[in-house]
Amino acid sequence: MIESQRHSYHLVDPSPWPISGSLGALATTVGGVMYMHSFQGGATLLSLGLIFILYTMFVWWRDVLRESTLEGHHTKVVQLGPRYGFILFIVSEVMFLFALFRASSHSSLAPTVEIGGIWPPKGIAVLDPREIPFLNTPIPLSSGAAVTWAHHAILAGKEKRAVYALVATVSLALVFTAFQGMEYYQAPSTISDSIYGSTFFLATGFHGFHVIIGTLFSIVCGIRQYLGHLTKEHHVGFEAAAWYWHFVDVVRLFPFVSIYWWGGI
């Protein structure tokens, strides 16, 4: 029997996924500590914890898609929650990446005597910012234009154009990741080469990791758009992906200026 309700909120059914995700996080944390201290079984527990977390993410998000797309539980009021929550998530990511860029800027503006009092540190070879770093900077900005194209196509009800635009977005993202992989392969320094190597690989590496997450996000949105899940009235998932992607492509300007250019001149 279908029960009616007099409010626009979604009262979720009991779910096992919060506790399963918590157990996966616990196993990952304990396994990671055991692995770093060379305890027997640490690698196995770490792997099982990561697998458990990935499985929980998949089935939990699957249930959310069913509730929103097939069951119609996500009213306009309900959609405000994910929107506000994702905006706060992006703000937290901005603070995280800003801390990494700030660490690099601080070390370059006030180099200590241990690294020769100069930046880059004495004896450290750096990448030429006019080569792969410069070539790789317009790519995420171009992919941001492609995801905006996809957004306008969804609002106009043009499903095929939205799919094409998302394919373009993902393709540019893969090119960016490939170039960054080449950059790391050709890098004359490593993460253990003084404060320069630590800040360089942490900041650029985490930005690259965010690009990979955004790529997966866009792939899922492309598949959902192809299957007809997204409409001009209901596309919160795509909006979150678009916001995230614009965050990623704009942030690219900061490591290029503060790390590649400032550290390579």
Swiss-Prot record:
UniProt gene name: COX3
Keywords: Membrane, Mitochondrion, Mitochondrion inner membrane, Translocase, Transmembrane, Transmembrane helix
Biological process according to GO: aerobic electron transport chain
PROSITE patterns given in the database record: COX3 (PS50253)
EC identifiers of the protein: 7.1.1.9
CC annotations in GO: mitochondrial inner membrane
PANTHER family attached to this UniProt entry: CYTOCHROME C OXIDASE SUBUNIT 3 (PTHR11403:SF7), CYTOCHROME C OXIDASE SUBUNIT III (PTHR11403)
Transmembrane stretches, start-end: 16-36, 41-61, 81-101, 162-182, 200-220, 245-265
Protein name: Cytochrome c oxidase subunit 3
Main location: mitochondrion
Pfam families: COX3 (PF00510)
Presence of keyword Mitochondrion: yes
UniProt enzyme class: translocase
The protein's role, per its UniProt record: Component of the cytochrome c oxidase, the last enzyme in the mitochondrial electron transport chain which drives oxidative phosphorylation. The respiratory chain contains 3 multisubunit complexes succinate dehydrogenase (complex II, CII), ubiquinol-cytochrome c oxidoreductase (cytochrome b-c1 complex, complex III, CIII) and cytochrome c oxidase (complex IV, CIV), that cooperate to transfer electrons derived from NADH and succinate to molecular oxygen, creating an electrochemical gradient over the inner membrane that drives transmembrane transport and the ATP synthase.
Domain of life: Eukaryota
Family: Belongs to the cytochrome c oxidase subunit 3 family.
Reaction catalysed by this enzyme: 4 Fe(II)-[cytochrome c] + O2 + 8 H(+)(in) = 4 Fe(III)-[cytochrome c] + 2 H2O + 4 H(+)(out)
Membrane topology: Multi-pass membrane protein
Organism: Helianthus annuus (Common sunflower)
InterPro entries xrefs: Cyt_c/ubiquinol_Oxase_su3, Cyt_c_oxase_su3_dom, Cyt_c_oxidase-like_su3, Cyt_c_oxidase_su3-like_sf, Cyt_c_oxidase_su3_a-hlx
GO molecular function: cytochrome-c oxidase activity
Subunit structure: Component of the cytochrome c oxidase (complex IV, CIV), a multisubunit enzyme composed of a catalytic core of 3 subunits and several supernumerary subunits. The complex exists as a monomer or a dimer and forms supercomplexes (SCs) in the inner mitochondrial membrane with ubiquinol-cytochrome c oxidoreductase (cytochrome b-c1 complex, complex III, CIII).
Localization (cell): Mitochondrion inner membrane
